[in-house]
Amino acid sequence: MVNERMYGLGAEPSAIRELFAYGMVRKAEIGAENVFDFSIGNPSVPAPDAVKQAVLELMDEEPSALHGYTPAAGDPRVRQAVADHIRRRYDVPAQPEQVYLTAGAAAGLAISISAVTEPGDEVIIIAPFFPEYKVWIGTAGCACVEVPAHVPDFQLDIDALAQAIGPKTAAIILNSPNNPVGAVCSRENLEAFAALLARKEEELGRKLYVISDEPYREITYGAEVPYVPCVWPRTIVCYSYSKSLSLPGERIGYLYVSDLMDDAREVSTAVAGAGRALGFICAPVLFQRVIARCIDEPSDVAAYAANRELLTTGLGELGYEFVEPQGA
């Protein structure tokens, strides 16, 4: 007898994955140059030269240790490098103990959800959203509550969130820049959201956690992307280098439990426990050390900006109405 829920997930893979697989078949049939695949988020920009150089140097310098285990939360030197980067960039008191290296943002999200919820809790997601959120929420034994974004600007709908947040709410997942529409939450919008959370915490007598899904943070076109922990301290940031360094297949990222929250150490301990329970041994070791060497490497968004300009101009000329993507 197999697990019915897991069988269902395996029997009906995500539409994104199905389209990606179909695209691979068509590329083999008619040539990759004739297939425009908008399904999965594979970057079209190669990884920076600094990444290749780091890999080559590491293969020469650390052959014996490079493929061994690290602590579950990651190499302490790499956690320190990530914490230093967060502190420099966002002016927050980031400590390495609050950084947990992960196999991409997906692992960080699954761990974070399990760390701050109990079975029967509710987790709010903002529509439109990445479909796998619902899978990870369900796996934690929680109910998924969908709240549509405000249309047409796709900002957080504060009134709708006020109605949705209730006694069972444990966490809200934010994704800015948003996948799939590319909207970026403004500082004003996030501040209104934080004020709502403060009121709701007092009203409900429970802590409300924000899980900020940030794989597209670097892929923006001039828009400010406020750092969520600076607006709402009770935030876990899930970051990935899949887009910023064009490394989706290497599965490397981190989650950062904001030092600004009053229960940061408790949450970090729960994160470690959730990682253990979900079977995450450690993030890929070679690329832990690669990101430490490439932590300040800038993202090349020129090709994405050109694609955006081409598509938005063409669609506008055809009479389509849309929100111009600010990122992703």
Model-based region annotation:
Residues 285-292, 304-316, 322-328:
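Conserved glycine-rich beta-strand-loop-beta hairpin in the small C-terminal domain of fold type I
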Residues 57-61, 257-262, 283-303:
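Amphipathic alpha-helix from the class-I
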Residues 245-249, 264-289:
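Active-site region of PLP-dependent enzymes
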Residues 227-267:
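Active-site PLP attachment segment
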Residues 2-104, 111, 294-301:
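N-terminal small-domain helix-loop-helix segment of the aminotransferase-like
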Residues 63-202, 217-232, 236:
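Conserved core of the PLP fold type I
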